[in-house]
Every structure is written in C-alpha cells, then in structure tokens.
Amino acid sequence: MMKCPQALLAIFWLLLSWVSSEDKVVQSPLSLVVHEGDTVTLNCSYEVTNFRSLLWYKQEKKAPTFLFMLTSSGIEKKSGRLSSILDKKELFSILNITATQTGDSAIYLCAVE
C-alpha cells in the first residue's frame, strides 16, 4: 500500500471539564496539523481540588466518543494505535496516537471529574 505524503490530519482541542471555577484544565497544543503516519502527543494538565478521574474523548461530527478513563498514576491504557497515561504527582496526562491516519482527524477532549 502506498502512502500519500501530502495527506494531512488536523487535530483540534477543546476544553471539556466538570470542575469548579477555581479549578483548571489546560490542553496543548490547541491545534495541530500532522502528516499521515506521524506520531502525535496531546497534553492535558490540571489543577483541581478533588480529583476522581481524567477522561479522554474524540469528537468527530456528533457527540464525543469515550476513549479512556484514567484514575491511577503510571498505568498506561491502550486501544489500537492510541495510548494514554496519567501522572497524578505532576498533574498531567498525555494521549499518544501512533501511525496517524486521516480518520484520526477530530477534536480531542480532556476532561477531569
């Protein structure tokens, strides 16, 4: 199968959080354009009073699709080409997408509850 180097993927972020006004969730980068086949790392940092879990979602045209729920530090969750890990000490999580495909083009959401 031949890869098209001109194929681009757009990865967008939105903030989705169920936290109080003094709590904060920050995602980076806010938007990203990558080539098909690249590896992408999306970051989510947070400052919350009462942490229960961190959730990742992918939103295409309709309602967001659940990807991962992370509650414990250092335990990597995987699903196909996607993986995520949580660091509760440093208050952040990453979402990795390997071998990106055009179907990965979407809005990715990080939420803390």
UniProtKB/Swiss-Prot annotation:
Positions of the Ig-like domain: 23-113
One GO term (biological process): adaptive immune response
Localization per record: Cell membrane
InterPro entries: Ig-like_dom, Ig-like_dom_sf, Ig-like_fold, Ig_V-set, TCR_variable_domain
Residues carrying sugar: N43, N96
Cleavable signal peptide: 1-21
Pfam families associated with the record: V-set
Keyword annotations from UniProtKB, A to Z: Adaptive immunity, Cell membrane, Disulfide bond, Glycoprotein, Immunity, Immunoglobulin domain, Membrane, Receptor, Signal, T cell receptor
Disulfide bonds: C44-C110
GO-annotated cellular components: T cell receptor complex
Subunit annotation: Alpha-beta TR is a heterodimer composed of an alpha and beta chain; disulfide-linked. The alpha-beta TR is associated with the transmembrane signaling CD3 coreceptor proteins to form the TR-CD3 (TcR or TCR). The assembly of alpha-beta TR heterodimers with CD3 occurs in the endoplasmic reticulum where a single alpha-beta TR heterodimer associates with one CD3D-CD3E heterodimer, one CD3G-CD3E heterodimer and one CD247 homodimer forming a stable octameric structure. CD3D-CD3E and CD3G-CD3E heterodimers preferentially associate with TR alpha and TR beta chains, respectively.
Function of the molecule: V region of the variable domain of T cell receptor (TR) alpha chain that participates in the antigen recognition. Alpha-beta T cell receptors are antigen specific receptors which are essential to the immune response and are present on the cell surface of T lymphocytes. Recognize peptide-major histocompatibility (MH) (pMH) complexes that are displayed by antigen presenting cells (APC), a prerequisite for efficient T cell adaptive immunity against pathogens.
Name of the featured protein: T cell receptor alpha variable 36/delta variable 7
Organism: Homo sapiens (Human)
